[in-house]
């Protein structure tokens, strides 16, 4: 087990460049071209939103803490960099990822209990056989090369709270943004500390509009606030004098300028979150469920 991120398998094996990640998905798509054409799926970000919402439903039924849920989201993301979605039953994959994450995060759940709750949520897609979860668990572990320890941005957020004098409201908003980043590719593209700094910046820069953003990710008012605020962040970094900048924002900008953190990466992450919230406005749970269910049933992946 790696005690720190920089010596971890997460840093060494599960951090991609954008082009590298796009190429990996293209290779998977080319190999499954007939099925992709036959069974269209929504935008990957919409698919991620749907999977995330199903995971949240399962976690609530079992009263599992956020970190285990986040680890499950990471497992699903990693798995789907190696396996094309249409080769799988996403309901079984997310159930198995959740079961495995609970073990790794030291809040284990009995396999039959997880199976029972999953069947309660998706009876038409989860077979009444716990061996299916066991088989899928082996598949996940194999595709992830047994590299199961995940470092999350929450720790950095907690460490910076007192140093940057963050209020409880700012911490709550930053936490919410971190939760939402698991719906994007950011967890495969940037280290956790960059994600945490991005979330802090959003929380502080958007403070006048935070009731819009924290209410829930993806609302149109939140999207507008974030879009406007991303311009504020760019202005903050480009303003060398700090004129007209709130004191806390200036302090964070100064701290960041004197750190080793990649400012361009923080800005890029902010733009990805804005993009997520824009896409979220198009989300329809009904459409996603129908499209996923169609290929799962047609290919017999629910058996």
From Swiss-Prot:
Q: Give the matching InterPro entries.
A: Cyclin-like_dom (IPR013763), Cyclin-like_sf (IPR036915), Cyclin/Ssn8 (IPR043198), Cyclin_N (IPR006671)
Top-level taxon in the UniProt lineage: Eukaryota
Any Pfam family matching the protein: Cyclin_N
Task: Kindly indicate whether the keyword Transcription regulation belongs to this entry.
Answer: yes
Q: Give each disulfide bond as a residue pair.
A: none
- Give all residue intervals belonging to the Cyclin N-terminal domain: 55-113
Compartment list: Nucleus
What GO cellular component entries does it have?
nucleus
Please give the chief subcellular localization of this protein.
Answer: nucleus
Asked whether the UniProt record includes Transcription regulation among its keywords, one would answer yes
Annotated GO molecular function terms are: cyclin-dependent protein serine/threonine kinase regulator activity
Keywords assigned by UniProt, alphabetized:
Activator, Cyclin, Nucleus, Repressor, Transcription, Transcription regulation
The annotated subunit structure for this chain is: Component of the SRB8-11 complex, a regulatory module of the Mediator complex.
What's the stated role of this polypeptide? Component of the SRB8-11 complex. The SRB8-11 complex is a regulatory module of the Mediator complex which is itself involved in regulation of basal and activated RNA polymerase II-dependent transcription. The SRB8-11 complex may be involved in the transcriptional repression of a subset of genes regulated by Mediator. It may inhibit the association of the Mediator complex with RNA polymerase II to form the holoenzyme complex. The SRB8-11 complex phosphorylates the C-terminal domain (CTD) of the largest subunit of RNA polymerase II.
Record-stated family: Belongs to the cyclin family. Cyclin C subfamily.
The protein in question is named RNA polymerase II holoenzyme cyclin-like subunit
From which organism does this entry originate? Coccidioides immitis (strain RS)
Q: What is the lineage of its organism?
A: Eukaryota, Fungi, Dikarya, Ascomycota, Pezizomycotina
